[in-house]
Amino acid sequence: MEFPKALIKRPNYHFEYPHKRKDKRIGRGFSIGELEKAGLNINNARKLGIIVDIRRKSVHEENVEVLKKFLEQLPNQKS
């Protein structure tokens, strides 16, 4: 089973061409706010193998949806 990855916004650099810039990149982990909106706490997320980035303060709705889908798939994998 593949663990979910968090998406975050990329910083804008003035030396990059706009057509080569991507809007999002893979982040270090999920923020605490995203975990709380998905119904998890830090300890349970780490037990499940989800990486937590405690420095991030932003909450992206896409990441919350990814976490909810991941949690729905867990009982199906165990049975």
Curated annotation (Swiss-Prot):
<dbReference type="GO" id="GO:0006412">
    <property type="term" value="P:translation"/>
</dbReference>
<protein>
    <recommendedName>
        <fullName>Large ribosomal subunit protein eL13</fullName>
    </recommendedName>
</protein>
<keyword id="KW-0687">Ribonucleoprotein</keyword>
<keyword id="KW-0689">Ribosomal protein</keyword>
<dbReference type="GO" id="GO:0003735">
    <property type="term" value="F:structural constituent of ribosome"/>
</dbReference>
<comment type="similarity">
    <text>Belongs to the eukaryotic ribosomal protein eL13 family.</text>
</comment>
<dbReference type="Pfam" id="PF01294">
    <property type="entry name" value="Ribosomal_L13e"/>
</dbReference>
<dbReference type="GO" id="GO:1990904">
    <property type="term" value="C:ribonucleoprotein complex"/>
</dbReference>
<dbReference type="InterPro" id="IPR001380">
    <property type="entry name" value="Ribosomal_eL13"/>
</dbReference>
<dbReference type="GO" id="GO:0005840">
    <property type="term" value="C:ribosome"/>
</dbReference>
